[in-house]
Amino acid sequence: MAVSSLVVGISDCKVTRDANSVLVTYALGSCIAVAMHDPVSKVSGLLHYMLPESAIDSKKAAQNPFMFADTGIPSMLDALKAAGGDGKRMIVRLAGGAQVLDSQGVFQIGKRNYLAARRILWKAGMLIAGEAVGGDVSRTTRLEVSTGRQWVREAGGVERELVRNSAGAKRTEQA
């Protein structure tokens, strides 16, 4: 069977259990991609959010919860559970959070996005198994639904797999 790519746009989330699918999102600058995979049910999801907190625009958050970390991550978890996933089994990885448009570091959207994800996941009792965050380059990431393997490619770089070690999280880069 042919593998199909499910493209996750900005302020978007896709959840699937189709083993022939790969979830992919492009051009992660300061945005964050949250990838989750349940190795038992094979339910996977990929969220691409723009901003850390919905309080800045509750109307937009109501229209599209995937725009913000604080509304997008819980909405993603609800969708994963509805598809048969178990939050306690989820392998979670992050990519993005770069400082690409704010060279002076005034707004630090990438860092704030990353910290929001960590806080929300921690409150949900979920550990981050791998991440490629920070820096000043954009990234593309893809999640293979059948295996839960995830790859990241930085602009101008080679694709590499985000791996999970036995102790839990393995950092590939830091914010």
Q: Can you annotate each of these PLM segments?
A:
Residues M1-C31, D38-A61, P65-I91, A98-A175:
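Short acidic-hydrophobic catalytic motif
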